[in-house]
Regions:
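Charged, amphipathic alpha-helical segments
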Residues: 1-4, 49, 98
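A short, Trp-centered hydrophobic/proline-enriched beta-strand micro-motif
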Residues: 8-23, 62-66
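A generic structural signal for short beta-strands and their flanking turns/coil linkers
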Residues: 12-16, 30, 38-40, 58-62, ...
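Histidine- and/or cysteine-centered catalytic micro-motif in compact active-site loops
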Residues: 21-23, 47-49, 67-69, 77-81
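A generic structural motif
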Residues: 34-35, 87
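A short mixed-secondary-structure module that forms the rim of ligand-binding clefts
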Residues: 35-71
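Charged, gly/pro-rich active-site loop segments
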Residues: 75-121
């Protein structure tokens, strides 16, 4: 299975386990939505006030795993990169994931920051 197919499976699953490293070097894990997959990159977002955001900014090392209904398990590790053109990416995330409008209506969406994993393994 090639890298793009693995990323597409993660997008189909959508809710994936996402691990980071905290300021004490300990692993932390939570469920995060895969928002966009294209050009062998996985895109996601989080709010600036969350510990997850701080961990991404401080260290950036992440690991993602999920299993679909066919029992295909996908693992991805790499470095998360904060994207430039934040407004453009957040708007695109909301276009492709309209249910986000219920959680973050109107301009409240701009509390979020978009990231990608570009060179994962």
């Amino acid at each position: 299975m090639n890298a793009m197919k693995c990323l597409e499976i993660l997008r189909e699953i959508k809710d994936v386990a996402f691990a980071t490293v905290d300021e004490n070097g300990k692993s932390q894990i939570r469920i995060i939505d895969v928002m966009i997959v294209e050009k062998e990159k996985l895109y996601f977002c989080t709010a600036r006030g969350k510990e997850f955001y701080q961990q991404l900014i401080h260290n950036g090392q992440v690991a993602v795993t999920a299993m679909n209904l066919a029992f295909q398990m996908i693992r991805l590790s790499g470095r998360a990169e904060k994207l430039s053109e934040q407004k453009k990416w957040i708007d695109r995330i909301f276009e492709e994931n309209p249910s986000m409008n219920q959680v973050y209506p109107g301009d409240s969406r701009y509390v979020l920051e978009a990231f990608c994993i570009a060179d994962g393994e």
